[in-house]
Regions:
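N-terminal edge beta-strand
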Residues: 19-36
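Bacterial N-terminal signal peptides that target proteins for export
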Residues: 1-6
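Short solvent-exposed capping/turn motifs at the termini of beta-strands
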Residues: 48-51
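Extended, hydrophilic extramembrane loops/domains of integral membrane proteins
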Residues: 182-204
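Membrane-proximal low-complexity regions enriched in glycine and acidic/polar residues
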Residues: 78-187
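Hydrophobic h-region of N-terminal signal peptides that target proteins for export
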Residues: 7-18
Length: 204
């Protein structure tokens, strides 16, 4: 049976008439996953349309986020016993966590926007919205959230690619994102953000 990974481009256009507009696209909207699937590469590209066709005096930056379907997850903490023996210790459940998350930017994210804006738009591995199912202390929650992010980074299910978005002539952009072999099937969403002077000018 062929299972399909389906990509949806989010429609989050900024409605202000005097603001620029992003026109995004992807190289393929369906990726067939069969037993021999070893991974793929997805090209995300698009154009920046400025009001009246006027180019700005200063170039803007681009951030692209690709997210997989959300899923519940249980994270266990290992504890060493008697030297080489490991056992499960504490654990934490998350009601919702993205099964895949990749972020790519034209420059390092911390140089583009502040932490508050990054958190609002869920930009960056440290700002992925997780929904803990268990009540616990803030320290415990932060520890398990960091553990989940680190685990998924090691398996290439969480990806951070600063400086990988190419912008040509200030209006055309493109970036290639890897799709690992163990990526889960389902609906994926791509979002693109236009950033300048610490502000999100447009999103699509």
């Amino acid at each position: 049976m062929i299972r399909a990974l389906i990509l949806l481009v989010a429609a989050l256009f900024v409605t202000a008439a005097r603001e620029p507009v992003l026109v995004p696209d992807v190289s393929q909207r369906n990726i067939d996953i069969v037993y021999s699937f070893t991974g793929a590469e997805l090209l995300l590209f698009g154009a920046i349309l400025y009001p009246d066709g006027r180019f700005p005096q200063r170039d803007a930056d681009i951030a692209v986020v690709l997210k997989g379907p959300s899923q519940p997850i249980l994270v266990r903490e290992k504890q060493r016993l008697l030297g080489t023996i490991w056992a499960n210790a504490a654990q934490a459940r998350f009601q919702s966590a993205p099964s895949f998350y990749a972020v790519a930017t034209s420059r390092p994210l911390e140089k583009l926007i502040d932490e508050r804006t990054s958190a609002i738009y869920e930009l960056g591995l440290g700002n992925i919205q997780l929904s803990p199912a268990d009540a616990g202390s803030p320290d415990k929650q932060a520890r398990f959230e960091n553990g989940l992010v680190n685990l998924r980074r090691k398996t290439d299910l969480f990806i951070d690619q600063p400086g990988s978005v190419e912008i040509t002539n200030g209006v055309l952009y493109r970036v290639r994102l890897p799709i690992p072999a163990r990526v889960p099937t389902g609906h994926y969403t791509a979002e693109t953000f236009l950033i300048r002077d610490g502000r999100i000018l447009a999103a699509a």
